[in-house]
C-alpha cells in the first residue's frame, strides 16, 4: 500500500502540479491511515471498506485532533481512493461517501492602524536585510498578496514603469498595483 501512496503523490506532483506542502500533508495523512488499516487487518487497497474508513475518521475525531485536521485527512483519503479507482486498483471508491467534520471558519484577526504602523516601522536599519524586510512588508501590506506569492516573486514579475506586480498561482495570472511607498521600498532594496 505504501507504493500506492508513492504513486499517488507522484501523480499529484506531475499531473495536478500540487504544492510541496499539499503533497507532504497528503502523504503524512495517508501513511497514518495505512497504519490504522494494517492494525485492523486490512493489508490491500482493494480490501478497504467504507466502514473501516468511517471507523478511522471516528478514531481521529475522538483522539482530540482539530476538525480542520480531520477534514484534511478525509480530503486526502477521498482524493487517494478516487485516484485508486481511476487507476483500477479498486473496483469501488470506499471513501466516496465519507463525511468530513464541519470546520468553523474564523474571521482573520485584523491589525489596528497603530499595530500596522508599528509593524511597517520595524525594519530600521539600512542593511541589505533591513531593506529586504522593509520591501517585503510594504509589498505584503500594499498588495494583499500571500506570503507564498511573495517568496516566489521574481524581478521579472515587477513592472516599475506601470507600478504593477504579476502573481502567477495555479495557472492564473493576476496583475496587482503597488503603492508608491511599496514601489520605493522595493527600488531601494534592489539598488543596495
Model regions and ranges:
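Conserved catalytic core of the tyrosine transesterase superfamily
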Residues: 1-192
